[in-house]
């Protein structure tokens, strides 16, 4: 284990991909070649061990990566912090969190399936955080592998400027090695696990094609790099050093994506990919990181990866380890030493750093100090995910991470009442770890409701309660997060009057509600059009409070009302009897009056569903989606597989994975992510309203 490398030699990289693109296998090979592990394990724990990066039992069993493990590795003189991120859409917050702390990333694509829906989602997240990336076309040994087609899809589907840096020698099961188009050398991977690299001249029969491809590569880089472009246009000779420097500049500037290829499973191309990570991806000094200065009205500040500047670190992930809470932290500026006192900017609490470790999945190595650019884990620090720590000299917070809304909820309770303490502990820990996992108690029913990003997301947490807290859980039927809105303008003029001896209550509010434009960012807007003081200024905020309260629960089925603008333009008050309370009540009742007149409708979440199955099953795949009120957006067939993309109501998607498995003999796969809200068909709407009325009547009867 080397000491801290100079910052120029540090790379903080993530591996992001569509589920089953071979991402965890690639991470495992990287750890093997960098000497962090001494044998290779396969992903699904068939050999009783499972991949090192998948360190929760559940992950090894399901063969999907859930928590992004942070691992430290060394390649030559470079220190590489590797973050393995989940590829399943239900775990998007983990991907977002790790991208927040990375300087660069490897986008893994399957050579057969190419750019899939989850690749698009992950890429969108990378764009949001301006993460430079290298594309790695994996599984080149598979039947139907097509390096050129995947590179073309990067341009068509993701709007990248892809430049192929390599050329495969052979394809599918005849994949022998790779040609590096910069060095113009052929590389072969010998030894039991591809650890012995043999460099040779390019085979004569491939030389012409390699020369053509090298020229295309130079043209591709010259298009986006001015310095290389000038040499190219002037017909000057271009050295390998000039070419590497140009690729690096263009990649870090997000102007191009170098495209590499290989097969992690067959141990081909991983070492060349590591060389490319060091050559083309930025060091922490070259990445731009912003913070908000709390002393200066949240003005943006650019952080400097200088170990001598005041300390700023971001807690981006929490885990409960054997020795207490483990806090993963990215150091953006300054340094932190064992025994230091640091300040949590979210609550101004001062905490001591008892222990700093470098993580290797769930194993750890103690270190005394971490400096700018490092990713480490601290013990004994109480905080929430996303908290910023400083040494107190500066009052900076890192920009808050984008947290998507939950789309599905579930009522849960422990099967055994004596397990209530563990049940509460588990929920408390999970909400701290994962901002997209939300818990609330339904006041009316007294039930505990958990909300998340999809069925699998919630299932995993229920399973974790059982495993980690010995708490079996009863779960209700999943509930869809419906919304209500209005379809036209509705007026209101409501007077709230109460006289019960002593001072009474009086308030009158008049105005209208109308739909907001469909592209509006906020879901509720309050407009004060009062002139002439018909409602005194001090009562206007109370009106806003009342309307805000009213939109929390619509009258059709009791779900939040979205997409409304409330305008008040008249009213009346009483010198003695008017109060904030009276105006708040009048606003609530006024909203209900206007809402009833504005033709309210129910909205349901629509999901973008992408299904992949052998093309023999195309009819049944499309048929199933149609049965579930789905709208087919596209179908593509390639290499014997059909990919169908559809928009389907979430309400009809429960149990879909079982149906798809049986319809495709277990060969079909699907991913699903939230797309938008749309009006519910009339018959569905009537059924939902009838069920809501019944529920209210039952609750009323129970209270009597």
Curated annotation (Swiss-Prot):
Location(s) in or outside the cell: Cytoplasm
Species, as recorded: Myxococcus xanthus (strain DK1622)
Alphabetized Pfam families for the sequence: EFG_C, EFG_III, EFG_IV, GTP_EFTU, GTP_EFTU_D2
Task performed by this protein: Catalyzes the GTP-dependent ribosomal translocation step during translation elongation. During this step, the ribosome changes from the pre-translocational (PRE) to the post-translocational (POST) state as the newly formed A-site-bound peptidyl-tRNA and P-site-bound deacylated tRNA move to the P and E sites, respectively. Catalyzes the coordinated movement of the two tRNA molecules, the mRNA and conformational changes in the ribosome.
Keywords: Cytoplasm, Elongation factor, GTP-binding, Nucleotide-binding, Protein biosynthesis
HAMAP family: EF_G_EF_2_B
tr-type G domain span: 8-285
Transmembrane parts of this sequence: none
The protein's name in its UniProt record: Elongation factor G 1
